C-alpha cells in the first residue's frame, strides 16, 4: 500500500469513528475529510485500533495566545500549528478510552517534558462549550 492509500484509509477509519457519534452525523464525509486534513498533514493525531478495527482517535493543536482565545470562544481551530500551547481538540472513543488516555499522558509527557500544561475544551452534543480544563505532564507518565 502506498503512503497516499494508507493516509486515505486512515482518514476513512477516523471518519467512521466520528460518524458513530450523534453530534457528527449531520456532517458529510467530505466535510470531515477536509477538517481532518490539517491534523493528519501535521501528524498531530493518533488512531487507536482494537482487534484491527478503529477504536479511538485523538487530535491536537499547538496554539499561540490569539488563536487560543479564538478556540476557547468558538471551539474552532483556525491554525493547528502556530504556538506552543497544547490543546486536545477531539478525543473520540468507541471502546478504548483507557488506552487513549494512557497513551495521551505518556506521549505529551515525553514530548513536552514534566510540568507542562495540556488543555482541552469540552463541548456537548449540541455544540455548547461546557468546560475548559487542563492537566499537567508528569514524570510517572513517561
Listing of model-derived features with the role each one plays in the protein:
Residues 139-142:
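Short, charged interaction patches at domain edges and termini
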Residues 35-51, 56, 62-67:
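A short helix-loop-beta-strand connector motif used in the catalytic cores of GNAT acetyltransferases and
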